[in-house]
From Swiss-Prot:
An example molecular function term from Gene Ontology annotations: RNA binding
S1 motif domain location: 631-699
Source taxonomy: Bacteria, Pseudomonadati, Myxococcota, Myxococcia, Myxococcales
Family: Belongs to the polyribonucleotide nucleotidyltransferase family.
Purpose: Involved in mRNA degradation. Catalyzes the phosphorolysis of single-stranded polyribonucleotides processively in the 3'- to 5'-direction.
Name of this chain's protein: Polyribonucleotide nucleotidyltransferase
UniProt KW tRNA processing keyword: no
Cofactor(s) this protein requires: Mg(2+)
Species: Anaeromyxobacter sp. (strain Fw109-5)
CDD domains xrefs: KH-I_PNPase, RNase_PH_PNPase_1, RNase_PH_PNPase_2, S1_PNPase
Principal subcellular localization: cytoplasm
Length: 722
């Protein structure tokens, strides 16, 4: 097959799509290039359906090869290790964007693999993986209702930029990655520095318009490769008569169950209804062995129809009766309670409860040594702010093995971390590494948003001087014809009902983090603005409830947190603190019980739970790095005698010269007549030249001590010591 290329311009960048050159045995493969960044995306779908499952078996893996940036992995085996957080989050973004577009009921196991094979240090590769996944699926025979395309939208100096470079992103006050089709925004994930809802809507519509050429390029690529027909498959059976019978037997019972407020009571009743349904069908078929056997064989199908009844009833209840589970209105938020400082030895802690969702959150303050070090394509990255989200099985009353965090937990943690990162103080004002851990104690929807709220409370309890409090809210939108219902603070039952599910975090002034999944077309600007406005109202209500526990950060950090003091020294004196083989700094830390971190610019951070220990370490460092001041008198030690003068150590690592003419106000024939090695001598600094060489005077120091000016005293000159 001859390689086929199509190009599209997105903003200032040209994106190349190429197929037919590599990975030709995959069912679809596309080479995506922007600048010198290249991602290879492949898709393969099994020939046979996977039995015994009730979900679409899709796997997405995004991987960054370090050779793409000319780097050798730093691991022992010099191979890439477990997925980084960015790889996991990008895999989730591709999955969330593509999964809803596969044909309903498609049962074949499908895998998307996106591999970064070249990285130019300017153009990020996650958007290329997203577009490449759609393109590879679009030109394959896999039943996929695409195409879609990915784009990153930034706002730099008030102007929107499509696919900004890494340098532009560093200056942006808005940074979102999104996927869009011709008539709908499909997925949104990103953060911002307290931008308004209006700006966010403008950004999303700008992004949707920016991908049109990319969509055309994918269509052209499919046509050029022969417009391969989609493979046939047997969709799930839809027995209308059986479906209606299930509805008739369960509708009123489901209605009664959803009137119950308590989650476990409601779930228990819904489970009983399912059992009653199967029993009723068996009793109806009593005496007919063939019908009984059919019911047993179709039990999974019957349960599916029952789930459809629940889904249909809840949507009708919301759109027709304007009523939700528990009797709440569309904009009503569950009862909120907050508590801080409940863990006595923790640097900062909170317990945030909203309805039946609860998060226990702890904040720990660490030093620069506690920063997370991550090897990425851009080099070694150091993270000084982290939020880790944990979802133990007891939070939903289940029994499961405790394992390492899954993709969902990593994704929820990243969303909450992004929301709070925007209000964290800069390192020069708060030189701590900050780790937040959110453990979900119970869950009935919006647990990631509870982590945002609880995380903010624990930061303030820890005395972290955040810019402003942050809250998060999970929203849902249901659209039935012209009827639209926007739900604030959705429950777990409502989570999968919506045509648009979105989470918005921010301060009272604006949005700091957003996540959206939109499953339908026709979501207009007006609907987006209305949805985000309702989310803003809910967010401000939650902030008010949080303020009842703590409204501003504590004035001081916990007594159990390390005290960090940063001092500055001249960079050339760093070697004096470290010493040969690190001997000096090890001695200081051992004797004072402190942790010391030195930056290349001469910033020295000393940390210890005891301020007295910090001061002791500072004193030792100052003694090693103090500078001679012009006009100041010191008691030094003679280290070497020469014909022209004597070299005197003022303090460790700092020597000066007393010229023979500066030894006495009388003529000195030989230096050794006045001084001897090892002798202590009073001297005055009379000059320091640009090279740092120090001139000393014994005669001026003695005269000053005697209260008179010596004859022929030298004028002090030179540059002050730095």
């Amino acid at each position: 097959m001859t390689p086929i290329q199509k190009t599209a311009r997105v903003g200032a960048q040209e994106i190349l799509l190429e197929t037919g050159k590599v990975a030709k045995q995959a069912h679809g493969s596309v080479w995506v290039r922007m600048g010198d960044s290249i991602v290879l995306v492949t898709v393969v779908s099994a020939a046979e359906k996977k039995e015994g499952i009730d979900f679409f078996p899709l796997t997405v893996d995004y991987q960054e090869k370090l050779f793409a940036a000319g780097r050798v992995p730093g691991s022992f085996f010099r191979r890439e290790g477990r997925p980084t957080e960015k790889e996991t989050l990008t895999s989730r973004i591709v999955d969330r964007s593509c999964r809803p577009l596969f044909a309903e009921g498609y049962p074949n196991e499908t895998q998307i693999i996106a591999t970064v094979i070249s990285f130019d240090q300017e153009n990020d590769t996650d958007v290329l993986a997203l577009t490449g996944a759609s393109a590879a699926l679009h030109l394959s025979d896999i039943p996929f209702n695409g195409p879609i395309a990915g784009v990153r939208v930034g706002r730099v100096n008030g102007q929107f930029v499509a696919n900004p470079t890494l340098a532009q992103r560093a200056e942006a006050d808005l940074d979102v990655i999104m996927a869009a089709s011709r008539d709908a925004i499909v997925m949104v994930e990103g953060g911002a520095k307290e931008v308004s809802e209006q700006v966010m809507v403008d950004a999303l519509l700008f992004g949707q318009a920016a991908v049109r050429e990319l969509l055309d390029a994918q269509d052209a690529l499919r046509k050029a490769t022969g417009d391969k027909p989609r493979r046939a498959f047997d969709p799930p059976k839809n027995d209308v008569a059986l479906r209606e019978k299930v509805k008739a037997l369960t509708w009123e019972k489901v209605k009664e169950a959803y009137a119950r407020n308590e989650k476990h009571d409601r779930y228990g009743r819904l489970s009983e209804i399912k059992k009653e349904l199967l029993q009723a069908l068996k009793e109806e078929a009593a005496g007919d062995a063939q019908k009984l056997a059919a019911i047993a064989l179709r039990e999974k199908e019957i349960k599916g129809y029952y789930e459809d009844v629940k889904y249909e009833y809840m949507r009708k209840m919301i759109t027709d009766e304007r009523r939700r589970i528990g009797g709440r209105g569309e904009a009503d938020i569950r009862k909120i309670t907050s508590e801080v400082g409940l863990l006595p030895r923790v640097h900062g802690s909170s317990l945030f409860t909203r309805g039946e969702t609860q998060a226990l959150v702890a904040t720990t303050l660490g030093t620069a040594e506690d920063e997370q070090r991550v090897e990425m394509l851009t080099g070694m990255v150091f993270k000084r702010f982290m939020l880790h989200y944990n979802f133990p099985p007891f939070s939903v009353g289940e029994v499961k093995f405790l394992r390492s965090p899954g993709r969902r937990e990593i994704g929820h943690g990243a969303l909450a971390e992004r929301a709070l990162r925007q209000v964290m103080p800069p390192e020069d004002k708060f030189p701590y590494t900050v780790r937040i851990v959110s453990d979900i104690m119970e869950s009935n929807g919006s647990s990631s948003m509870a982590s945002v709220c609880g995380g903010c409370l624990s930061l303030m309890d820890a005395g972290v001087p955040i810019k402003a409090p942050v809250a998060g809210i999970a929203m849902g939108l249901i659209k039935e014809g012209e009827k639209i219902a926007i739900l604030s603070d959705i429950l777990g039952d409502e989570d999968h009902l919506g045509d648009m599910d979105f989470k918005v975090c921010g301060t009272a002034e604006g949005i700091t983090s957003i996540q959206m999944d939109i499953k339908i077309g026709g979501v207009t600007r007006e609907i987006l603005e209305r949805a985000l406005a309702q989310a803003a109202d809910g967010r401000k209500h939650i902030l008010g409830e949080m303020a009842k526990a703590i409204a501003t950060p504590r004035e001081s950090i916990s007594a159990y947190a390390p005290r960090i003091t940063t001092i500055k020294i001249r960079p050339e004196r760093i070697k004096d603190i470290i010493g040969p083989g690190g001997k000096t700094i090890k001695d200081i830390t051992a004797r004072t019980g402190t942790s010391i971190n030195i930056e290349d610019d001469g910033s020295v951070s000393i940390a210890s739970p005891s301020q007295d220990k910090v001061e002791a370490a500072i004193k030792m460092i100052r003694s090693l790095t103090q500078e001679a001041e012009i006009g100041k008198t010191y008691l030094g030690t003679v280290r070497k005698i020469a014909e022209f003068g004597a070299f005197v150590e003022l303090f460790p690592g700092t020597d000066g010269l007393i010229h023979i003419s500066e030894l006495s106000d009388k003529r000195v024939k030989s230096v050794s007549d006045v001084l001897s090695e090892g002798e202590e001598v009073l001297v005055k600094v009379i000059s320091v030249d640009r090279a740092g060489k120090i001139r000393l005077s014994r005669k001026e120091a003695l005269a000053e001590a005697a209260g008179k000016k010596p004859e022929g005293a030298a004028e002090t000159k030179g540059e002050p010591a730095k």
